[in-house]
């Protein structure tokens, strides 16, 4: 009887320990941790589930998941650009997810058609110009920037970065390879200087008068406009009379080898909620994917815009063609 009593006490202690054990999830992410920390802290407060972040380069993180196989700690892979998410799905990193909440909160064109990954913020890429040189009446479309009237006025970020590859991919989907190549060749003919390594330097070149126009992700402009010296930078929403502004995403999917799929789905659903979407928009100055959430007040002043509703998975499937086209057009 004494042995049974001791055994029951031990089992009770184990049971209590298990009840008090904190559930955990691990995100492998190429996003900056400070963008996510306020959201995952709120998630922990609401659910009691702790979220660990492992940050790094997207390609290296995908390779790590491949190498780790079924032993991977990753429950969620999160990154920027639909092209990279498409690559991850193509490498069989993600599992399919069934969720009415994600279905409701995220527009169909901002997620994988097979529900392997989901957009969590929108990134609009459009025209920015120097108000010292031009007015918004001077602009219309991305394609118009190939016109010789802009010779010596255009600055661009390199095509070696995924953002411009995705923009080119969206144009290939709309116009085909040959017509898009004509446009990109026109851009190159109109360059004022060599291409830049990032959007911020291209914007600074426009502000300083080194060139007059560029194409960038809007959150880079929003960050620069915190400094009054860049007040001469103005935004123009491209292609409002046809397909709309090119949008890309940051997003995430559940890793196939995850042992915590239920909680991982719960976290993705939370990231698509109004609370998280508003926090995310405040932190990164990107646009929410949830219609009822509001962007940062500094970018609300730019007004509403029509966006291209191509399914963003095509930005991945057409990426190889975009790279080839850039090479053929001389876009470094």
Task: Please annotate each region the language model reported.
Residues 16-86, 332:
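Early extracytoplasmic/lumenal segment of secretory-pathway proteins
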Residues 159, 163, 170-238:
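Ligand-binding pocket segment of bilobal, Venus flytrap-like solute-binding proteins
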Residues 28-30, 113, 129-131, 137, ...:
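Short beta-strand->loop
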Residues 297-332:
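Extracellular/periplasmic bilobal clamshell ligand-binding domains
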Residues 88-96, 108-115, 224-238:
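Ligand-binding "clamshell"
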Residues 126-133, 247-260, 279-282:
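A bilobed periplasmic-binding-protein/Venus flytrap-type ligand-binding module shared by bacterial periplasmic
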Residues 152-160, 270-293:
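Periplasmic-binding protein-like
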């Amino acid at each position: 009887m004494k042995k049974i009593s001791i055994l029951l006490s031990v089992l009770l202690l184990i049971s209590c320990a298990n009840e008090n054990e904190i559930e955990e999830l691990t995100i492998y992410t190429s996003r900056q941790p400070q963008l996510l920390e306020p959201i995952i802290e709120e998630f922990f407060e609401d659910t009691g589930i702790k979220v660990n972040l492992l940050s790094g380069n997207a390609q290296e993180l995908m390779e790590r998941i491949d190498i780790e196989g079924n032993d991977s700690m990753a429950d969620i892979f999160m990154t920027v650009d639909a092209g990279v998410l498409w690559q991850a799905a193509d490498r069989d990193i993600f599992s399919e997810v069934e969720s009415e909440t994600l279905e409701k909160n995220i527009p169909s064109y901002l997620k994988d058609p097979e529900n392997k990954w989901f957009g969590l913020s929108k990134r609009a890429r459009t025209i920015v110009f120097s108000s010292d040189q031009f007015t918004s009446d001077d602009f219309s479309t991305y394609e118009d920037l190939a016109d010789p009237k802009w010779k010596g006025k255009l600055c661009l970020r390199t095509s070696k970065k995924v953002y411009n590859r995705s923009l080119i991919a969206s144009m290939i989907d709309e116009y085909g390879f040959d017509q898009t190549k004509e446009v990109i060749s026109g851009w190159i003919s109109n360059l004022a200087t060599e291409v830049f390594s990032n959007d911020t330097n291209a914007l600074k070149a426009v502000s300083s008068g080194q060139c007059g126009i560029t194409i960038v992700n809007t959150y880079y402009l929003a960050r620069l406009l915190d400094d009054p010296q860049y007040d001469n930078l103005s935004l123009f929403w491209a292609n409002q009379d046809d397909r709309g502004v090119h949008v890309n995403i940051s997003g995430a999917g559940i890793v196939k080898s995850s042992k915590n799929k239920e909680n991982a789905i719960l976290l993705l659903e939370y990231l698509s909620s109004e609370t998280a979407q508003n926090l995310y928009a405040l932190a990164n100055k990107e646009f929410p994917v949830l219609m009822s959430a509001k962007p940062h007040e500094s970018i609300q002043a730019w007004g509403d815009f029509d966006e291209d509703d191509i399914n963003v998975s095509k930005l991945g499937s057409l990426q190889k063609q975009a790279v080839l086209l850039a090479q053929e057009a001389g876009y470094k």
